[in-house]
């Protein structure tokens, strides 16, 4: 019975995985971010650059309504000086909940909502999107590489080729742009097989390519290529979704070290308490 259930489950998994592979999932790059792994940390300068890209490019459409502006000065993040955070907040206009009047933003306010109704909020985007899925539709890859949210964002931002797939020539959806990583957009019928399954990676997205080389000018003179800016803003959005990530890692490391020391002490104590008993031989009365 157990063997039959196992075979049935394996068959279902293979079929669902095969369907997912045949559907032409989006292509996601594996980016070696500094914060990955148990000992990884956010790069403060990268987060500051990512904030600049978000402010000058992404914020025109996308909001981050769950992120308080004051968190920009907190440890583990961009760590901007408090005077810079206050100055940064003033560029936003918010509606005071008590008076109902518009006023300049304060560090205690949150980032604004998305400017467009159909523009996704980016507060939790790095946690809401999965870039890695593993073979045959399983989550094995996520066990080793993580969910891959930042990689997904990076891949979408850099996934606009100069030419669309040949199957779409002359049949591209109006007002949409082909993206190798975006999976849930529209696909012309010419890029589908007889069963209606798309035959190309990615799909068409309403967002035009948001980045181009040297679109922003970094104060530290860092490279401002499309790939560099995409990596910076992806890291920043990961921090926005997980602002306490470094603190959690530190707490986890401390807990592991404490439990390790405690285990050693308990082992030595147990050995000492039972040393006199375990060393004696039983005698027949």
UniProtKB/Swiss-Prot annotation:
Binds 1 heme c group covalently per subunit. PANTHER family: CYTOCHROME C1, CYTOCHROME C1, HEME PROTEIN, MITOCHONDRIAL. Residues 1-22 form the signal peptide. GO terms for cellular component: plasma membrane. This is Cytochrome c1. InterPro entries: Cyt_c-like_dom (IPR009056), Cyt_c-like_dom_sf (IPR036909), Cyt_c1 (IPR002326). Its main location: membrane. The chain crosses the membrane at residues 251-269. The gene is petC. The lineage of its organism: Bacteria, Pseudomonadati, Pseudomonadota, Alphaproteobacteria, Rhodobacterales.
């Amino acid at each position: 019975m157990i063997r039959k259930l196992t075979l049935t489950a394996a068959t279902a998994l293979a079929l669902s995985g095969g369907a997912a592979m045949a559907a032409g999932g989006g292509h996601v790059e594996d980016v070696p971010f500094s914060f990955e792994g148990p000992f990884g940390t956010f790069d403060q300068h990268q987060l500051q650059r990512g904030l600049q890209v978000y402010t000058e490019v992404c914020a025109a459409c996308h909001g981050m309504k769950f992120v308080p502006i004051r968190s920009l000065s907190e440890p583990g993040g961009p760590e901007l000086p408090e005077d810079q955070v206050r100055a940064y907040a003033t560029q936003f206009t918010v509606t005071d909940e008590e008076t109902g009047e518009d006023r300049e933003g304060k560090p205690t306010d949150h980032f604004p909502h998305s400017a467009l109704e159909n523009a996704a909020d980016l507060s939790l985007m790095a946690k809401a999107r999965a870039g890695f899925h593993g073979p045959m539709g399983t989550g094995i890859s996520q066990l080793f590489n993580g969910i891959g949210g930042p990689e997904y964002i990076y891949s979408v931002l850099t996934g606009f080729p100069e030419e669309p797939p040949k199957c779409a020539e002359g049949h591209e959806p109006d007002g949409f742009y082909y993206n190798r990583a975006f999976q849930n957009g529209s696909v012309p019928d010419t890029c589908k097989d007889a069963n209606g399954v798309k035959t190309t990676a990615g799909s068409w997205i309403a967002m035009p390519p948001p980045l181009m080389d040297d679109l922003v000018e970094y104060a530290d003179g860092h490279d401002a290529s499309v790939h560099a800016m995409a990596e910076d803003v992806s890291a920043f959005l990961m921090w926005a979704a997980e602002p306490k990530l470094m603190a959690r890692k530190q707490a986890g490391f401390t807990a592991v070290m404490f439990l390790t020391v405690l285990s050693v002490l308990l082992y030595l104590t147990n050995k000492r308490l039972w040393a006199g008993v375990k060393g004696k031989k039983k005698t027949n009365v």
